[in-house]
């Protein structure tokens, strides 16, 4: 049985473990599609995507169409004659004409247990909503948004200390085996498809920077989830006077508070206790504008005074 001719489409780091596995598998990785280089950083220099960097390092041809609205981009893909297209966080919508090019269709590695958390930010939403588990789903793509039939699922627990960053890394690594299993099933014509139950579907919309501001009138547990869901981006923040204070790490406590939500109750070597709508939140790692991430203990030892008991965080 011959290996499959695979075209990969992806942009961020999430797809790299699968790319590493693909190139070592019996399948033939013929080309990589990724988004065009974008200006990034203070200098606004054009930056290649992690997937493009990987492809160049492994001498795999790279294609970067702006979209697939023009026939030339569609014909270019068609000329590669792929058996299957593997799509992981590509960030471009694939029209029906593209989905029909590969002999075995396009399969997508999605970072949730579908039909829960269809959409752009499944990892963040799993943490925001306190899900006990997350996982990856390999599905056959159709013209809907993450609505296609499922080929394989793999689950993992979401811990109380997981951030979007740590869960991202776990899911990226654990997606390798399900993807390879699905490719083998497709190659041997033994793949089994399960339709999604649309009644159970939830939607994970794109996360915006504007959502990162902490609302101290929420519960300590809800704020803790937000801080973890928005780490490493866009990072939850509050205002200490006129200063933006980013909060990188915190945890809900069982310390009841009757003070106004947002009031700093205490600062010591263990962290900064802040009142919420119920129990206090213990803030452990912070960042002031233009400064490095620092523990509250180290900030306390620095002798600085921007934060103090009784200050209202907004």
Curated annotation (Swiss-Prot):
GO terms for cellular component: cytosol. GO terms for molecular function: methionyl-tRNA formyltransferase activity. SUPFAM superfamilies: FMT C-terminal domain-like (SSF50486), Formyltransferase (SSF53328). It holds the Pfam family Formyl_trans_N. It catalyses: L-methionyl-tRNA(fMet) + (6R)-10-formyltetrahydrofolate = N-formyl-L-methionyl-tRNA(fMet) + (6S)-5,6,7,8-tetrahydrofolate + H(+). It comes from the Bacteria. The keyword Membrane does not apply. PROSITE patterns: GART (PS00373). Its EC number is 2.1.2.9. (6S)-5,6,7,8-tetrahydrofolate binds at residues 112-115. It is an enzyme of class 2 (transferase). The gene is fmt. Attaches a formyl group to the free amino group of methionyl-tRNA(fMet). The formyl group appears to play a dual role in the initiator identity of N-formylmethionyl-tRNA by promoting its recognition by IF2 and preventing the misappropriation of this tRNA by the elongation apparatus. This is Methionyl-tRNA formyltransferase. Belongs to the Fmt family.
């Amino acid at each position: 049985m011959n290996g499959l001719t695979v075209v990969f489409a992806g942009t961020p780091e999430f797809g790299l473990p699968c790319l590493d596995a693909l190139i070592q598998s019996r399948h033939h990785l013929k080309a990589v599609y990724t988004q065009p280089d974008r200006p990034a950083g203070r200098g606004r220099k054009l930056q290649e995507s992690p997937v493009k960097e990987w492809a160049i390092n492994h001498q795999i041809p790279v294609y970067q169409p702006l979209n697939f609205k023009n026939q030339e981009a569609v014909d270019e893909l068609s000329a590669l004659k792929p058996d299957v297209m593997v799509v992981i966080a590509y960030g471009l919508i694939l029209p029906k004409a593209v989905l029909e090019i590969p002999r075995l269709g396009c399969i997508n590695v999605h970072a949730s247990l579908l039909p829960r958390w269809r959409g752009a930010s499944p990892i963040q939403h799993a943490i925001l909503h306190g899900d006990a588990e997350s996982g990856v789903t390999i599905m056959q793509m159709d013209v809907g948004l993450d609505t296609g039939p499922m080929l394989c699922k793999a689950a993992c627990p979401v811990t109380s200390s997981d951030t979007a960053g740590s869960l991202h890394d776990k899911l990226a690594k654990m997606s390798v085996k399900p993807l390879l299993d699905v490719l083998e099933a497709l190659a041997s014509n033994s793949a089994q498809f399960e339709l999604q139950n649309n009644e159970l579907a939830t939607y994970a919309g794109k996360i915006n920077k504007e959502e990162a501001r902490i609302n101290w009138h929420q519960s300590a547990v809800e704020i803790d989830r937000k801080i973890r869901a928005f780490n490493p981006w866009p990072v939850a923040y509050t205002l200490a006077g006129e200063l933006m204070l980013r909060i990188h790490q915190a945890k809900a406590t069982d310390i009841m508070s009757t003070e106004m939500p947002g009031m700093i109750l205490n600062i010591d070597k263990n962290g900064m206790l802040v009142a919420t709508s119920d129990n206090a939140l213990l803030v452990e790692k912070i960042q002031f504008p233009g400064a490095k991430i620092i523990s509250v203990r180290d900030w306390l030892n620095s002798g600085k005074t921007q934060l103090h008991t009784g200050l209202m965080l907004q």
